[in-house]
Every structure is written in structure tokens, then in C-alpha cells.
């Protein structure tokens, strides 16, 4: 069983992603901490009052709704999963630390400015991957952040399939990146990244909503 954590903002791509997991050849256990995506999770299963403890099964997809957890316990969830869908900046940093393949949902901004920042990080994050693995990461991240539009020639479902196909490489890459980022102070590494893309922003710290 593939274990996936899902912590996300509202996203019109969710049901397409769930469709892919429902039809997956490998069983998927999706763990959803209580948050903004929860109403859409419930809607997929015709439950318009989802809550902590809700448990859903469709095809090869099994979804469990977890309580919202503090950061330290959230780290344990990230480490326990094979793939992590994370949102905002706090969870992004923790996903890097966790050393697991992840998909980042950047906070949406006016005029899609956030997509330029996303692509800048994608270029940095995937530069040590081979061609097919790099493409798989970029296609899925872009599809998730564009509400399911992976590009002119690829759907979210296709992007997910390619991502899973490359999962062994992506696990090794995530562990490599975690070690590299841990060698120096993580905040300094993030500052270097922000300078590289020409956008220095104050990172939201623990306790702030993202």
C-alpha cells in the first residue's frame, strides 16, 4: 500500500487526483489532516459533513481524516508516508527535511505570480534528476498548482502515473536533498534560493497560518 499524506488548500484538481488513486493498480492510503481541503474530500465521497475520524473507500483508494496536528507530530506523519502533498511555506520546509518525495502547493497569488516562483524552485529542486524523473516532478507539481491542468499534452492522471513510475529515483533524490539542505542552516539555504529567483520574502514561521 502506498501511504500518502494530503495537506492542501482548496484545489479543483483534487477529484481528478482521487480518480487516479481510485483506479490505481497499487492500493493507496491517503491520510488527510483536518484543514481547508476537507470539504472537497467529503464531496468526492458524497459526504457533505466530513469530520475527524471519517473513513472512505472507493476502488483502490482508502482515505482517513486525521485531527489537525502540531508541527512536531506533523513531522512524524511526513516521515511515515511514501509521498507527501504539502501546502504553504512551513509544510514545504518540513517536507524537505523529511526526505520523502513530495508535491508542493504554493500559496496562490494574483495574476499567477506564484507559478513563476514555483517553477524557479522546481528548476532548482530537479536539476540533479535525470530527464524522465525531472519531467515527472515538474508535470505533477504544475498540474496540482494549476488546478489539474498539467499542460497542453498531459493530464493530472498522466502526470501522477509518470510520477509513480519514477518513485524509486524520487525517493533517492529526496533523501539526497534532505542531506544537502541539512549540511548548512536551512534558513540560509532558503534565503539563497530566494535570492537566486530574485524574490526575497519573509518566510512564515511556525504558528502563522499558511
Give the location of each predicted region:
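Catalytic donor nucleotide-activated moiety binding site of glycosyltransferases and closely related
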Residues: 26-67
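C-terminal amphipathic helix plus adjacent low-complexity
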Residues: 128-210
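Active-site donor-nucleotide binding/catalytic segment of nucleotide-sugar enzymes
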Residues: 1-40
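A donor-sugar binding/catalytic signature common to diverse glycosyltransferases
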Residues: 68-117
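Short acidic (Asp/Glu) and glycine-rich catalytic loops that position anionic groups and cofactors
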Residues: 58, 96-102, 167-172
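Post-HExxH zinc-binding segment in Zn-dependent metallohydrolases
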Residues: 117-129
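Short active-site oxyanion
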Residues: 2-4, 28-29, 61-62, 80-83
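Short, hinge-like loop/turn segments at secondary-structure boundaries
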Residues: 48-50, 103-104, 121-122
Amino acid at each position: 500500500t502506498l501511504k500518502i499524506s494530503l495537506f492542501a488548500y482548496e484545489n479543483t484538481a483534487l477529484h481528478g487526483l482521487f480518480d487516479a488513486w481510485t483506479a490505481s493498480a497499487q492500493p493507496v492510503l491517503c491520510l488527510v489532516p483536518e484543514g481547508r481541503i476537507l470539504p472537497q474530500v467529503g464531496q468526492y465521497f458524497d459526504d457533505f459533513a466530513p469530520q475527524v475520524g471519517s473513513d472512505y473507500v472507493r476502488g483502490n483508494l482508502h482515505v482517513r481524516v486525521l485531527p489537525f496536528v502540531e508541527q512536531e507530530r506533523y513531522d512524524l506523519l511526513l516521515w511515515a508516508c511514501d509521498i507527501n502533498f504539502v501546502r504553504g511555506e512551513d509544510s514545504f520546509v518540513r517536507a524537505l527535511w523529511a526526505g520523502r518525495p513530495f508535491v508542493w502547493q504554493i500559496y496562490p497569488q494574483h495574476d499567477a505570480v506564484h507559478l513563476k516562483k514555483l517553477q524557479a524552485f522546481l528548476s532548482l529542486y530537479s536539476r540533479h534528476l535525470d530527464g524522465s524523473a525531472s519531467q515527472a516532478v515538474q508535470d505533477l507539481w504544475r498540474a496540482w498548482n494549476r488546478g489539474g491542468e498539467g499542460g497542453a499534452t498531459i493530464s493530472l492522471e498522466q502526470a501522477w502515473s509518470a510520477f509513480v513510475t519514477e518513485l524509486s529515483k524520487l525517493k533517492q533524490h529526496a533523501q539526497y536533498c534532505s542531506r544537502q539542505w541539512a549540511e548548512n542552516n536551512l534558513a540560509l539555504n532558503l534565503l539563497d534560493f530566494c535570492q537566486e529567483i530574485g524574490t526575497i520574502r519573509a518566510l512564515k514561521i511556525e504558528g502563522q497560518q499558511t
